[in-house]
């Protein structure tokens, strides 16, 4: 606990974090509570146990003063867990927006599978607000991704026009994506990956490729990766606000490739300033935690990060 307390230099944020954490534990019983208290708990199977409690209302997230955006989860966070575990844990931490990954709902899912998946989300009071990130190695892959988004019923695809190892964007794919955006009225946000990937390492590299295209092509601003590349995510949010359609929350230990993912509030990103800026630019999308530390046992870090960010949202003036 001492290490956690030292991560909060702002006493107002600390007190609000403790309040939020306390309320979550009051509503958490048995093994779920032990998981939140003990990061070494090896068995997460109880998270899939159906609870008798009613889902938390989406409107009751306590997002703070003047917020027009939603706190969500990037599905990649749960890449080692099934959708039942994911949704049960999201209920426990009172987060209700999910960017859907294809390991939870396959790209070739048919109408019946999509309907069953959406019913499961609704049971847990979770909204699937987007799909992705989806890598699009060629035009057929782009067409498949947009058909998938239509079946799921979302208005945003987070993607990359190319493959992980590509050195430059696939402009044939991007051209087709622009056509698909016009045909479907589904927006497209290119995800940046910092210094780990040649394609679109920061927000500016995306901006250069979308600025003269349909305004429904934009940016998924991963603030941790943007910073690790040496860019300034605060500056980029201000510069490109009208084209930022999705945001992935991360904190990191250094503004370099060697920077590692860490719980929100323990790294070098100024989250009170970030929240103030989100409000100033009028951002209206989702702000989704993509937690990439301890991905085989992430629950305590996710809970801490969500509690911290909610506290910042309630205290940032």
Explain the meaning of each model-derived region.
Residues 74-78, 101-105, 133-136, 161-164, ...:
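Active-site beta-loop-alpha junctions enriched in small/polar residues
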Residues 14-30, 34-47, 53-55:
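Arg/Gly-rich low-complexity intrinsically disordered repeat tracts
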Residues 149-168, 184-195, 288-289:
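Active-site groove signature of glycoside hydrolases
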Residues 182-272:
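Acidic/histidine-rich catalytic cores of soluble enzymes
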Residues 83-87, 111-114, 140-146, 169-175, ...:
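Distinct, well-ordered alpha-helical segments
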Residues 1-17, 22, 49-52, 59, ...:
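N-terminal pre-domain/capping segments
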């Amino acid at each position: 606990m001492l290490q956690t307390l030292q991560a909060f230099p702002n006493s107002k944020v600390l007190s609000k974090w403790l309040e939020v954490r306390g309320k979550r534990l009051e509503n958490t019983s048995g093994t779920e509570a032990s998981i939140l208290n003990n990061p070494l708990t090896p068995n997460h199977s109880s998270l899939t146990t159906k609870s008798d409690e009613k889902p938390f209302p989406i409107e009751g997230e306590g997002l703070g003063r003047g917020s027009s955006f939603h706190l969500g989860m990037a599905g990649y966070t749960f890449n080692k867990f099934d959708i039942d575990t994911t949704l049960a844990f999201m209920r426990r931490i009172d987060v209700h927006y999910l960017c859907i990954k294809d390991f939870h709902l396959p790209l070739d899912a048919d109408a019946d599978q999509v309907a069953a998946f959406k019913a499961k989300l609704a049971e847990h009071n979770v909204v699937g607000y987007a799909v992705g990130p989806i890598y699009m190695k060629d035009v057929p892959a782009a067409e498949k991704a947009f058909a998938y988004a239509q079946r799921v019923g979302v208005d945003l695809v987070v993607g990359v026009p190319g493959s992980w190892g590509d050195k430059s964007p696939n402009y044939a794919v991007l051209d087709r994506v622009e056509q698909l955006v016009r045909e479907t009225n589904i927006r497209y946000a290119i995800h940046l990956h910092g210094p780990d990937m040649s394609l679109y390492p920061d927000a500016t590299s995306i901006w250069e490729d979308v600025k003269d295209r349909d305004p429904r092509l934009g940016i998924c601003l991963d603030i941790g990766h943007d910073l690790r590349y040496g860019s300034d995510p605060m500056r980029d949010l201000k510069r490109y606000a009208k084209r930022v359609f999705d945001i992935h929350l991360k904190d990191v230990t250094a503004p370099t490739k060697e920077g590692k993912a860490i719980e929100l509030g323990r790294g070098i990103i100024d989250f009170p300033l970030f929240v103030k800026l989100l409000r100033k630019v009028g951002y209206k999308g989702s702000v989704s935690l993509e937690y990439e530390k301890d991905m085989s046992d992430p629950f305590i870090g996710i809970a801490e990060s969500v509690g911290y960010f909610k506290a910042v949202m309630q205290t940032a003036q």
